[in-house]
């Protein structure tokens, strides 16, 4: 019996070393049941190695990891996890229905149960008209969608998706987003490893930023994207001491002629900044606030050197 009160994913100082290279260093993470969790980092940051350790495809050098409150080696736990890898090679001589039926057999599903589930999933990923085609005839996007159907075949409690929108057109990406939202509504936990930050921004509840194999920040997505504001001010009579005084609201203030760029913690600071400038005799012509995108936050948190 899998305990339902335990986190969907829990790691403690999980570490993987290949020779003299630390791929993942002291990964400590907790993903709650029913949330969509984004795992973000540049190439080479250790994301895929972390996923492989969670799936017991790569053994950790040290540390602990649990899925759904149980051991990674527990067959019952493994049977409640669905996985879509970034790079896959499916049996391309099989038809779409045959491919899913093969995996249904591996899950020991009854014939009637398998047929019903396969029909539902083909409809979910919009592949019903192509169910009789061999996988070698599928486009990259169609293969991605049949892979997603395979990951959901066992109605898992935890779904791990590694770059699920890779190779998809805008319609396909929207379909994947809709599937993820439906999984959330059903209480399924989704662990999303993606470099498409715009997709993460739309779908995730919380995100973790990983760099050099270590988690450097975990935060609710809403507090990230609704928090800081990037503000551009166009004004005259800007004396150096006045510009310096803006540091009480912003840790980053840049002056370029009649333009000031600063970062505020929230909208509540806007009237105070405007009032301060006017009281200092500054002629304010424009004050333009703009939400910082997840991409900009990613660069701020992870840096421009990426995972190298």
Question: Where in this protein do the model-derived segments appear?
Answer:
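Solvent-exposed amphipathic alpha-helical surface segments
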Residues: 107-110, 280, 305
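ABC transporter nucleotide-binding domain
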Residues: 176-264
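ABC transporter nucleotide-binding domains
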Residues: 6-11, 16-211, 215-217
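An acidic, carboxylate-rich microenvironment
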Residues: 62, 76, 98, 113, ...
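Short, charged/small-residue-rich alpha-helical element at the C-terminal edge
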Residues: 230-301, 308
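Pre-NBD coupling/linker segments of ABC/ABC-like ATPases
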Residues: 1-5
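Short low-complexity, flexible loop/linker segments enriched in glycine and/or proline
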Residues: 207-208, 300-303
